[in-house]
Regions:
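Domain-level signal for soluble alpha/beta catalytic cores
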Residues: 1-369
Length: 369
């Protein structure tokens, strides 16, 4: 049995209030009784007299949507469309409240000529400040555009969409969609690791949903977002066929640009795109090649042997070993050489400084201007 808890008098009062607000038809549904209907009929036939300052219908004043403005879009997208060779640099959010080092690093990179700052989200599943807050802070305090790393792992649909709206409200327009690192390797291995969307699905949600003014359920969100969406790409994958299929799906779902895993052998990267083009045609979207400056022999050996998707040629590892204590300087020289090698076919580079050495990234940017 369905019960309606409110009494007839209350029901009748609001029936008349709805009439005054403009309702053309008022009725009772599940749980209402004949007494409720009689009270409604009486209230509608004999409305109470209005006093001079009585409550009437609520007047709703709609504020016009704020204009998008000339700077609401992605400046990174504009540069890529114009054929500018762009430089993106990854930064990690702080582990606490202090942002002095972060902002100083962003300012250094901006002065060197970085096109955009990429802000990572909980790299290696370590607890850090939320990246969309960092993006807003860097853009406001330093004035350099940012790209928000947006992993799907650990987010349900509610949080995904809420975080996207928050980022857009803070002025973030570039989003780099990734799966994210599993919590098992980080600070809280027992933390929930569930997700509702894979990266390909999130790309579709943003480009075919939010950027058209609707959410995942098809409900309107008002003014459409204007996100410029990047996707991840591994140019030396353990399963080439699967990576090629993922690339095709990401393109079909609307990816605007791609950031690759660190590259140390340009010929391998070029071969990947030749293989894709042979069966699918040109990728047709900007590629920003990952550049991770080597810091020393241990660093190079770790990346080569323990990080999936990264292969460092023997010749480069030999150079780093021979450099000894000058390993960081040799790493910068190798990075500059790699950038010059990919410049003819890439639309930019994505520099990932090791151990927070933003000064080395700035040196690389200065050298390739």
């Amino acid at each position: 049995r369905i019960m309606y808890p409110a009494g007839p008098e209350y029901f009748g009062h609001y029936a008349d209030a709805f009439r005054q607000a403009g309702a053309a038809l008022v009725g009772g549904c599940c749980g209402t009784t004949p007494g409720h209907i009689r009270a409604m009929r009486t209230a509608l036939d004999h409305p109470p007299k209005k006093s001079g300052n009585g409550n009437g219908a609520v007047r709703i004043i709609e504020r016009p949507e704020e204009p998008a403005g000339p700077d609401s879009g992605s400046r990174l997208a504009e540069k890529l469309r114009a054929g500018v060779f762009v430089t993106a640099v990854e930064m990690d959010p702080p582990r606490g409240l202090s942002t002095h080092k972060l902002l100083a690093g962003a300012d250094l990179l901006s002065e060197a000529g970085a096109s955009v700052i990429n802000v990572a989200d909980s790299p290696m599943a370590r607890m850090r400040m939320s990246p969309w807050g960092v993006c807003g802070l860097v853009q406001r305090e330093v004035g350099v555009e940012t790209t928000l790393h947006f992993p799907t792992r650990g987010r349900n649909l509610l949080r995904v969409q809420g975080d996207l709206l928050a980022a857009h409200a803070l002025g973030v327009r570039n989003v780099f969609v990734v799966m994210g690192d599993p919590t098992a390797i980080g600070d809280y291995p027992e933390a929930m690791d569930n997700y509702d969307l894979a990266p390909t699905g999130l790309i579709r949600l943003i480009k075919q949903g939010f950027n058209t003014g609707v959410d995942h359920s098809g409900s309107e969100i008002g003014q459409p977002t204007s996100f410029h969406v990047g996707a991840a790409l591994n140019l030396a994958p353990p399963d080439l066929k699967r990576e090629l299929q993922l690339l095709k799906r990401k393109l079909a779902n609307g990816a605007d640009f791609f950031l690759t895993q660190p590259v140390y052998d340009p010929s391998v990267a070029k071969a990947f795109f030749e293989t894709y083009s042979a069966g699918n045609g040109d990728v047709g979207k900007p590629i920003l090649v990952g550049i991770l400056p080597l810091f020393g022999t241990r660093h190079a050996n770790f990346l080569h042997n323990e990080v999936p998707g990264i292969e460092i040629p023997d010749a480069i590892r030999a150079r780093i070993e021979a450099a000894g204590s000058d390993g960081p300087k040799e790493g910068v020289r190798i990075a500059i050489e790699l950038i010059e090698a990919v410049r003819p076919w890439a639309q930019g580079v994505y520099i990932i400084p090791a151990f927070g050495r933003y000064d080395l990234a700035a040196e690389i940017i200065e050298a390739i201007k």
